[in-house]
C-alpha cells in the first residue's frame, strides 16, 4: 500500500483537473448542441456519446499522468529538484503539494519511473485508438503521436524545448485547442455525423469554438507560469531557460496578470453573451405565457423556472470566478506561489463548471 501511495503522489493527481478541464468543456458544448435539438442523434447514439466522452477523459488523464512521470524522471536526471526543498513556504507555512518531492525520494529507481511513463502513455494511446476507430477520424493517430513526442521532449532528450522558453506555449496548445477541439471532433464524428452535417461548419462557429479553447489552454499556461516564476532562479542555475526566467519575476508577473485578465474576459463573454443574453432575457420576457423551453434533457422538457435558476447559478459562479481571479493575480504579484497554484486549478475547474451548467441553456448562438 505504501508503494502505491508513492506512485499516486508521483502522479501528482492535483494537476489532473488542468488536463481534464478542456475535455469537460468540449463535452458540455457538444451536449448543448445535442440537447437543444440543433443536431439530431438517434437514441442508440447517446450511448456512443457517453462512452466517447469517458474515453476522451481517460486519454487526457493518463496523458497528464505520463507527462508528470516524465518530468519527474527527466528533471531528476538533471538535478533540477535537488535544491527545491529549500524554497520558501507560503505565508501560512504550508508547502505546495510537495512539489519538490520526487519518486527517487521514496527509493524508486529511475528505470521504474520510466516504465511508469510508458505504461501511462500506453493506456492513453489505447483509449485514443478506440476513439479513432469509433469516430473514423484517422488523423487522430498522427495527432496522438505528436502529443506523445511533445510530452517527452518537453523535458527529455538532449535539447528539451521546455528549457528554451516554449513550455508555456506548449501547455496552452496541447491542453487548449488540441484537447478541446480534438474532443469536439471525436464526439461529433462518433455520434454519426458527416462533415456536411456538423453544426460547426460555419466560420463563426469554428471561430467561437477556437476562442473557447483558449480558456483551458490559458489556465494550463498560467499554471506553468506559476511553476516557472517560482523556480526562475533555480532554473537559470541549471540552464533551464523558461519564458518566465527570461522575463524575470516582475515582468513575468505582469504578463501573467494580462493572461488571467484575458481569460476572465473570455469567460465573461461566454456566460453573458452566449448563455445569459441570448436565452435568459427571452425567458424573462415570456413569463406569463404558456411557452416552455423545449429541451431533450431531463425527460424531454426543461421549464422556465429551472432554466432561470441555472442562469442565476451561472452568474453566481462567474462572480466567484472573478473574485478568485483577482486573488490569483495578487498572489502571483506577491510571490505567494504556494497559494497561487491551487487558486489557478480552482479557477480552471470553475470555468469548466460554468460550461456544464450552460447545458441547461439548451442552445448555442446561430
PLM-predicted stretches and their roles:
Residues 84-134, 240-277, 345-351:
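Multi-pass membrane catalytic core of lipid/isoprenoid biosynthesis enzymes
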Residues 68-72, 101, 149-162, 224, ...:
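C-terminal ends of transmembrane helices
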Residues 170-232, 250-253:
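Functional transmembrane core segments of multi-pass inner-membrane proteins
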Residues 17-26, 169-184, 244-249, 340-355:
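Small-residue-rich segments of transmembrane alpha-helices in multi-pass membrane proteins
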Residues 272-366:
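Extended hydrophobic alpha-helices typical of membrane-associated regions
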Residues 23, 29, 41-70, 141-152, ...:
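Membrane-embedded alpha-helical segments that form the functional core of polytopic membrane enzymes
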Residues 62-92, 221-244:
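Acidic (Asp/Glu-rich) catalytic motifs at the cytosolic membrane interface
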Residues 99-194:
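Intramembrane alpha-helical segments
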Amino acid at each position: 500500500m505504501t508503494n502505491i501511495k508513492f506512485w499516486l503522489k508521483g502522479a501528482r493527481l492535483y494537476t489532473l483537473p488542468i488536463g481534464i478541464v478542456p475535455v469537460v468543456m468540449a463535452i458540455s458544448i457538444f451536449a448543448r448542441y445535442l440537447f437543444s435539438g440543433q443536431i439530431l442523434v438517434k437514441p442508440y447514439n447517446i450511448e456512443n456519446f457517453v462512452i466517447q466522452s469517458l474515453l476522451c477523459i481517460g486519454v487526457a488523464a493518463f496523458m497528464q499522468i505520463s507527462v508528470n512521470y516524465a518530468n519527474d524522471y527527466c528533471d531528476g536526471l538533471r538535478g533540477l529538484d535537488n535544491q527545491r526543498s529549500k524554497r520558501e513556504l507560503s505565508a501560512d507555512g504550508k508547502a505546495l503539494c510537495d512539489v519538490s518531492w520526487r519518486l527517487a525520494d521514496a527509493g524508486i529507481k529511475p528505470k521504474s519511473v520510466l516504465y511508469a511513463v510508458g505504461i501511462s502513455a500506453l493506456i492513453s494511446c489505447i483509449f485514443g485508438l478506440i476513439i479513432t476507430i469509433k469516430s473514423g477520424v484517422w488523423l487522430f493517430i498522427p495527432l496522438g503521436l505528436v502529443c506523445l513526442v511533445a510530452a517527452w521532449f518537453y523535458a527529455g532528450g538532449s535539447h528539451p524545448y521546455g528549457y528554451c522558453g516554449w513550455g508555456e506555449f506548449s501547455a496552452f496548445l496541447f491542453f487548449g485547442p488540441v484537447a478541446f477541439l480534438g474532443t469536439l471532433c471525436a464526439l461529433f464524428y462518433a455520434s454519426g455525423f458527416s462533415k456536411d452535417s456538423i453544426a460547426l461548419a460555419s466560420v463563426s462557429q469554428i471561430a467561437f469554438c477556437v476562442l473557447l479553447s483558449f480558456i483551458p489552454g490559458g489556465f494550463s499556461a498560467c499554471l506553468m507560469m506559476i511553476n516557472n516564476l517560482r523556480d526562475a532562479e533555480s532554473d537559470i542555475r541549471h540552464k533551464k531557460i523558461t519564458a518566465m526566467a527570461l522575463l524575470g519575476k516582475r515582468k513575468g508577473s505582469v504578463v501573467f496578470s494580462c493572461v488571467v485578465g484575458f481569460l476572465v474576459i473570455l469567460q465573461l463573454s461566454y456566460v453573458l453573451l452566449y448563455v445569459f443574453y441570448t436565452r435568459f432575457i427571452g425567458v424573462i420576457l415570456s413569463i406569463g405565457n404558456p411557452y416552455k423551453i423545449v429541451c431533450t434533457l431531463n425527460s424531454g422538457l426543461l421549464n422556465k423556472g429551472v432554466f432561470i435558476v441555472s442562469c442565476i447559478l451561472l452568474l453566481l459562479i462567474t462572480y466567484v470566478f472573478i473574485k478568485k481571479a483577482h486573488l490569483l493575480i495578487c498572489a502571483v504579484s506577491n510571490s505567494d506561489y504556494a497559494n497561487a497554484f491551487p487558486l489557478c486549478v480552482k479557477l480552471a475547474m470553475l470555468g469548466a463548471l460554468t460550461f456544464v451548467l450552460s447545458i441547461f441553456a439548451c442552445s448555442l448562438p446561430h
